[in-house]
Amino acid sequence: PDFDDFESMVQVTAASIRSLLGPTTPFNLAGFSFGGLVSANVAAQGLAVKRLALLGPGGHGGPRRERGKLVNWKRALTDEELLEAMRFNLWAHMIYADEQIDPFAIGIHTYSCINTRFRSRGISGRGLLGPALDVYPGPTLIVWGEHDITCTPDYLMMHMIEGQPNRRGVILPDVGHWVNFEDAERVDPILVDWFAV
């Protein structure tokens, strides 16, 4: 569907889950980046979310650490220019280690950029994550990469995790924003353990 705004996206997503699972069926919910912000806001809608896991969630409202200005890939005139723009943007925004920027990562990133149906950039800076987490009372895991440029993980640990007994924060060393791609060997077991409870 076409979404007019973030709130309508959250409402439609929550309604779809209720329709598919029923209003009282417990389920676990996870999201990455903007999907983490959406997941937190869906969980705040009163659904039967047992446990929530957010990987490098957007919408925190805290400081960012830019690594480089993103290239406008829509201006690419050739396949080579598009490939180079995507490679650079992965380095500048998503992945810390150069060797992780492989054809598979570039392919996923390119497909996602070309096929996105919702422009999230302006929403991710609005600070909508904290209020949603304050409403959702269940266990919440947030995983950040140490070099995530979309945030300052230590700052968020202090402001979103400390003093919140239902929240757990993990900062993974030597990875960037796309933690679930760049370090699946560490992220996958963390998620399996989190949702196994």
Question: Where do the PLM segments sit?
Answer:
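Catalytic active-site module of serine/aspartate enzymes centered on a nucleophile-bearing elbow/loop
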Residues: 165-197
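Flexible "cap/lid" loop of the alpha/beta hydrolase fold
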Residues: 37-44, 50-81
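Catalytic nucleophile loop
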Residues: 31, 35-36
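Conserved alpha/beta-hydrolase catalytic His-Asp/Glu region
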Residues: 65, 80-138
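Conserved loop-alpha-helix segment in the C-terminal half of the alpha/beta-hydrolase fold
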Residues: 141-175
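Active-site loop/oxyanion-hole signature of alpha/beta-hydrolase fold enzymes
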Residues: 1-30, 45, 189
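Conserved catalytic-core motifs of eukaryotic protein kinase domains, centered on the activation segment
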Residues: 1-2, 64-66, 153-154
